């Protein structure tokens, strides 16, 4: 939603852009930017899920960087110019985009996702209203919630943490395990909806500082190649990547298992980590999230591997570095 103030009064006029699609494209962004510029808008309200917020972020970046095409913004610190006043109103509990410095957009010609990271992309204001999420269908509730869980887990197990990111990530994990199945089965439970919104926010705060990992690197590129919803891709991929990390992530995953109250006395760190991964698989199964991605095609695997590693290495501070063979193995495990 784009706003324009009237100089003659205190009334605000608005221009609405509602063409954003899941995995927003360059065209979506340029259309939104054109609407903003042509109507002399002065502020932006991003209302919706992660796709809407990411589209709005990059449209705002294009407003202040009119001579910089979107591909040139890819990576870190490529905007570096203050955005117009920016308000984020999430209607899903998952992406945490209302508090992150990141936006992800799709090049429709190459089917490649571009991650754009810059502190100026963090919205100035965020409104967390659980009433806006009560109408979400169960499958959106579940996959966006697992998206938030992925943010918290990848932030916590990485090597770029602070005390604050650790606390926010653990808090988010506990809140999600305590509430996600409740909101999946009873979408009108306003208290649980509020907890999920806060969990998504805390996870967003955590990964904005501590980054994510290979789950996101692979999910972004599956989304770009096949249009798979980001939360769904993360939910399916998460346990496979955690298994790949093995011993390098056991201690951290054990701590998250304790935060989620799924451990038993006498368990080793390895057993706690395995219990945590099993609990993620169980959540997926209980919420009818598949454990394979049918769209993956054999001919696309080399491109998926190349693009995932290009995104992940060396930016993401992961517990264990993937090489091409490792990444291919994980992607093949995702195939039916």
Which residues does each PLM region occupy?
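Single conserved hydrophobic/aromatic residue that forms the stacking wall/gate
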Residues: 1-8, 12
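Glycine/threonine-rich beta-strand-loop-alpha-helix active-site module
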Residues: 27-34, 38-131
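Short beta->alpha junction loops
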Residues: 16-26
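Flexible, glycine/charged-enriched surface loops at secondary-structure junctions
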Residues: 160-168, 183-195, 210-215, 267-273, ...
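C-terminal catalytic subdomain
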Residues: 210-275, 281
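C-terminal charged capping/lid subdomain of soluble metabolic enzymes
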Residues: 253, 260-336
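Carboxylate- and glycine-rich phosphate/diphosphate-binding segment that chelates Mg2+/Mn2+
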Residues: 102-210
């Amino acid at each position: 939603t784009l706003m324009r103030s009237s100089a003659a009064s205190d009334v605000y006029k608005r221009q609405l852009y509602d063409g954003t699609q899941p995995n927003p494209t360059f065209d979506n962004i340029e259309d939104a930017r054109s609407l903003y510029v042509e109507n002399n808008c002065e502020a932006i309200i991003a209302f919706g899920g992660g796709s809407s917020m990411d589209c709005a972020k990059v449209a705002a970046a294009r407003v202040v960087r009119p001579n910089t095409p979107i591909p040139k913004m890819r990576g870190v610190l490529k905007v570096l110019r203050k955005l117009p006043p920016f308000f984020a109103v999430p209607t899903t509990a998952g992406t945490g985009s209302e508090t992150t410095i990141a936006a992800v957009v799709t090049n429709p010609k190459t089917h490649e996702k571009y991650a754009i990271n810059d502190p100026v992309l963090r919205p100035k204001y965020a409104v967390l209203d659980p009433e806006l999420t009560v109408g979400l269908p169960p499958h959106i509730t579940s996959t966006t919630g697992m998206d938030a869980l992925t943010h918290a887990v990848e932030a916590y197990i990485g090597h770029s943490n602070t005390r604050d990111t650790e606390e926010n990530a653990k808090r988010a994990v506990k809140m999600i395990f305590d509430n996600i199945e409740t909101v999946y089965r009873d979408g009108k439970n306003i208290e649980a909806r509020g907890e999920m919104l806060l969990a998504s926010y805390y996870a967003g705060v955590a990964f904005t500082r501590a980054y994510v990992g290979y789950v996101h690197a692979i999910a972004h590129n599956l989304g770009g190649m096949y249009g798979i919803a980001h939360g769904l891709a993360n939910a399916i991929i998460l346990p496979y990547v955690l298994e790949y990390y093995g011993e390098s992530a056991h201690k951290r995953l054990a701590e998250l298992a304790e935060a989620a109250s799924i451990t038993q006395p006498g368990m080793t760190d390895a057993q706690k980590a395995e219990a945590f991964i099993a609990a993620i698989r169980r959540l997926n199964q209980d919420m009818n999230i598949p454990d394979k991605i049918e769209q993956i095609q054999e001919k696309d695997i080399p491109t998926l591997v190349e693009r995932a590693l290009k995104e992940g290495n060396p930016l993401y501070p992961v517990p264990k570095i993937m090489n091409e063979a490792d990444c291919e193995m994980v992607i093949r495990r995702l195939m039916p």
